[in-house]
Amino acid sequence: MAPDPVADIVVDARGLACPQPVIALAKAVRDAPPGTIASVECTDAAARHDVPAWARLTGNEFLGERPLAANKTDGGAFALTVRLR
């Protein structure tokens, strides 16, 4: 398995409810060039559907999901990563 790509842009959307994580991601990458890797850190399970759908609809590449380091305050946080095309 290949290592996780290093994100050029990281969006902290933990604690935000749908559709805010995908909106925050879209705003953060608005002026980013193709090839940019962006990761959005989330706690809202709906983002697992929204971010890949956004990537598909905008012609970008969804690279996957990874859990964030577990601690007592993370609320089951995870990161969703995309590559801009």
Segments the model singles out, each with a brief description of its role:
Residues M1:
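Class I SAM-dependent methyltransferase SAM-binding "motif I" and its flanking Rossmann-like core
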Residues D4-A13:
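Immediate flanking context of iron-sulfur cluster ligation sites
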Residues D8, G35-S39, A77-A79:
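Intrinsic-disorder/low-complexity, polar/charged segments enriched in Ser/Thr/Lys/Arg/Asp/Glu/Gln
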Residues A13-L63, P67:
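Amphipathic, hydrophobic secondary-structure cores in small proteins
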Residues P67-R85:
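C-terminal edge-of-domain segments
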